[in-house]
């Protein structure tokens, strides 16, 4: 019934299996991939005919994690998987980025990749396996695809690079780098690092590239056995339409790209585009070319004009040379009620970044296949349409916004203080108010400034820069701080963020073959110079964290209580902790290890809550004086509640100096008194005294008498 084909190999000490022919046989391509005991199913389907009226490749990648893969039932009311999680969105982008450039130019057929995680061993992250399975499914599908693609993860543990570290090993790693590419070229890099050098980062990229070569070989072997007949792809002759567009537009387009202001340049380019449309689509005659072909030819001519100017003249769209960073203005403290704020402007790109500090209650609960965990650092990136002078959809963030936010999150996170050093939940919001390239890196710069403005003790400020590359044969040019046009007209887009000490985040997307290790080294070195320049400009606004937290930020103090006392502090049904919160006004968060965080904007509120918690969790000390309340008066003395829920007896002989006839002559129920803890009797009952305490001042009279006696002897 099944015609199953399988390839197996040992990859970084674990078995990788690629199988096709048993599951999802009606898809154009389907591969079941297993690494360790993690299994994913990748399927790909592409329409047989192009989608009319579009000038882009309609590729959709959907990565989905099923809770059953880890033996879990989803949370929530409906108990089933819902909208994509942040990780699912990020992995979908991770798969999309290296495969998209490998489809033929002009391919307009609707194409959908669906990757489903079926089993997760909690040791091998499914993301790399998902990328490998997708590549294999495309390679055997018969769909036009210039692959296969391989992928690998590289860590840096105990001073050595490690291929495909496990989930646990990654927790100890100073690097989390994912690299993807073909047999002879790197196409994509995504990473987070703890201030590593450019040299080490490049070495990690090349280690990953070498590491996935056996996987590419295995995919090729699978395709030799199981690949479908390749589809025929009609290759359009573009020479005639390109010549027609060039004759009409080249001269004026060159002039348009001498205009340095973005909006004015766009107007000039639109005017040239309108001229082409008028010439090639006359109202009184049948057009020679389709609108899609003319639009494609015009875009290609735009790219050529920009590239010629850069390679031949060394001049960029806005008039800069290759290495110059646009003018920078950094401002902090611009929002009066925010805990920390910054406005970072670089040329025509601007980010308004706001830092907010919260308590443990504000931590985000993240539900994943590995289990539920809490995240104390959040970074949200928003890209409203007005930032590029357009109208558009507003609402929940799209994939691009989630991806850009995660890139900035990775860049800043290694510089944050630990939870023990700074027990706050931190949220960053970056509002992109203007954009002309590199808005995610503006978010990195603005985030550092806003955090320091809020008083967060960063190890060092972080800055980021977006770089580009133009490659024609043997000639190439590396561009610092690219514009939006240079991004989509160039051959490589990579973003580097870090401190003066090293790189904290690197993202790279390469669109063409031929970019060598040497070219990437030149680009990384040039990016370092740009990053250090930006850090210098940022230091003009703020060089380090403010000494005090923002005026409106909550204050948090921590204390440790014995774990066996947690239940007493919380009380039955939360009764005790609710009473503490209601009466002191402080927020209280108790961890399983006995760490208690008490937060309030009022210092007295924090002190009162801490004293209350200590009175419950700690044992009273002999010789200490406490304030208490008389709860019962009896013939032989009075019972006083003096330490949380603890009561003790003040014997009638200890109520006052001299003889006391009746206890009620000295104290009454409900009266506030000061008592000294004398100790405990044979049965563990508490013995208290009032006679040795000044009821007005709380002074220890016994200690005072002893001191006076000692002084007289001396």
Curated annotation (Swiss-Prot):
Q: Give the E.C. number(s).
A: 2.7.7.8
Please give the SUPFAM superfamilies that the UniProt record associates with this protein: Eukaryotic type KH-domain (KH-domain type I) (SSF54791), Nucleic acid-binding proteins (SSF50249), Ribonuclease PH domain 2-like (SSF55666), Ribosomal protein S5 domain 2-like (SSF54211)
Report the residue ranges that make up the KH domain in this protein: 554-613
Where in the numbering of this chain does the S1 motif domain appear? 623-691
Domain of life of the organism encoding this protein: Bacteria
The positions annotated for binding Mg(2+) are: 487, 493
Q: Does the keyword Cell wall biogenesis/degradation apply?
A: no
Q: Which GO terms describe its biological process?
A: mRNA catabolic process; RNA processing
The entry's keywords: Cytoplasm, Magnesium, Metal-binding, Nucleotidyltransferase, RNA-binding, Transferase
A Pfam family of the record is RNase_PH
| Main localization, broad class | cytoplasm
Annotated catalysed reactions? RNA(n+1) + phosphate = RNA(n) + a ribonucleoside 5'-diphosphate
One GO CC annotation: cytosol
NCBIfam families per record: polynuc_phos, PRK11824.1
Q: Which family does it belong to?
A: Belongs to the polyribonucleotide nucleotidyltransferase family.
Tell me, in a sentence or two, what this protein's role is. Answer: Involved in mRNA degradation. Catalyzes the phosphorolysis of single-stranded polyribonucleotides processively in the 3'- to 5'-direction.
The identity of this protein, by name, is: Polyribonucleotide nucleotidyltransferase
User: Where does this protein come from, organism-wise?
Assistant: Methylocella silvestris (strain DSM 15510 / CIP 108128 / LMG 27833 / NCIMB 13906 / BL2)
The gene is: pnp
């Amino acid at each position: 019934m099944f015609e199953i084909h399988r390839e197996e190999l040992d990859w970084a000490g674990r078995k990788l299996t690629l199988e096709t022919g048993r599951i999802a046989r009606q898809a154009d391509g389907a591969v079941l991939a297993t690494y360790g005991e993690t299994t994913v199913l990748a399927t790909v389907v592409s329409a047989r005919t192009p989608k009319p009226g579009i000038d882009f490749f309609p590729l959709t990648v959907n990565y989905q994690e099923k809770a059953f893969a880890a033996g879990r039932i989803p949370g929530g009311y409906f108990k089933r998987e819902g909208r994509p999680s942040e990780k699912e969105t990020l992995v979908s982008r991770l798969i999309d980025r290296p495969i998209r450039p490998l489809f033929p130019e002009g391919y307009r057929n609707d194409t959908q990749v669906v990757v489903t995680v079926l089993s997760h061993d909690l040791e091998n992250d499914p993301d790399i396996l998902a990328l490998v399975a997708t590549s294999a499914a495309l390679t055997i599908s018969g769909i036009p695809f210039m692959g296969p693609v391989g992928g690998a993860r590289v860590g840096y543990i105990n001073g050595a690079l490690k291929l495909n570290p496990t989930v646990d090993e990654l927790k100890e790693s100073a690097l989390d780098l994912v690299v993807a590419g073909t047999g002879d070229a790197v196409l994509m890099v995504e990473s987070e690092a703890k201030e590593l050098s450019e040299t080490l980062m490049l070495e990690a990229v090349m280690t990953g590239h070498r590491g996935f070569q056996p996987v590419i070989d295995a995919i090729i072997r699978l395709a030799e056995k199981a690949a479908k007949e390749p589809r025929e792809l009609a290759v359009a002759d573009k020479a005639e339409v390109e010549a027609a567009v060039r004759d009409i537009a080249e001269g004026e387009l060159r002039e348009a790209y001498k205009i340095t202001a973005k909006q004015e340049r766009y107007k000039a380019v639109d005017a040239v585009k309108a001229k082409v449309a008028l010439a090639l689509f006359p109202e009184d005659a049948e057009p020679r070319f389709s609108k899609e072909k003319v639009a494609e030819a015009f875009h290609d001519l735009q790219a050529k004009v920009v590239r010629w100017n850069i390679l031949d003249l060394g001049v960029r769209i806005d008039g800069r040379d290759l290495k110059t960073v646009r003018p920078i203005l950094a401002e902090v403290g611009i929002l009066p009620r925010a805990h920390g704020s910054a406005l970072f402007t670089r040329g025509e790109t601007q980010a308004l970044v706001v830092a907010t500090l919260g308590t443990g209650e504000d931590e985000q609960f993240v539900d994943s296949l590995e289990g539920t965990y809490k995240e104390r650092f959040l970074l949200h990136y928003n890209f409203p349409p007005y930032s590029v002078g357009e109208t558009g959809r507003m609402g929940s963030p799209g994939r691009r916004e989630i991806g850009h936010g995660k890139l900035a999150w990775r860049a800043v996170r290694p510089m944050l203080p630990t939870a023990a050093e700074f027990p706050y939940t931190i949220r960053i919001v970056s509002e992109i108010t203007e954009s002309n390239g590199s808005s995610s890196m503006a978010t990195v710069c603005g985030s550092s400034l806003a955090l320091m403005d809020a008083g967060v003790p960063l190890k060092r400020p972080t800055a980021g820069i977006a770089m580009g590359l133009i490659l024609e044969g043997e000639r190439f040019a590396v561009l610092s701080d690219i514009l939006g046009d240079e991004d989509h007209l160039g051959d490589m887009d990579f973003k580097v963020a870090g401190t003066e000490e090293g790189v904290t985040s690197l993202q790279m997307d390469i669109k063409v073959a031929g970019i060598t290790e040497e070219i990437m080294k030149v680009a990384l070195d040039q990016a370092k110079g740009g990053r250090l320049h930006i850090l210098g400009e940022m230091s003009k606004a703020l060089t380090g964290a403010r000494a005090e937290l923002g005026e409106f930020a909550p204050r948090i103090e921590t204390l440790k209580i014995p774990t066996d006392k947690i239940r007493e502090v919380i009380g039955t049904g939360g009764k005790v902790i609710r009473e503490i919160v209601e009466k002191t006004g402080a927020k209280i968060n108790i961890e399983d290890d006995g760490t208690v965080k008490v937060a309030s904007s009022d210092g007295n509120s924090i002190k009162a809550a801490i004293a209350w918690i200590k009175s419950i969790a700690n044992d009273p000390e002999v010789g200490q004086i406490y304030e208490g309340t008389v709860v019962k008066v009896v013939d032989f003395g009075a019972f006083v509640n003096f330490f949380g829920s603890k009561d003790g007896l003040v014997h009638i002989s200890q109520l006052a100096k001299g003889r006391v006839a009746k206890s009620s002559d000295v104290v009454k129920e409900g009266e506030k008194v000061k008592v000294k803890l004398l100790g405990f009797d044979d049965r563990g009952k508490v013995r208290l005294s009032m006679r040795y305490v000044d009821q007005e001042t709380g002074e220890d009279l016994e200690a005072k008498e002893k001191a006076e006696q000692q002084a007289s002897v001396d």
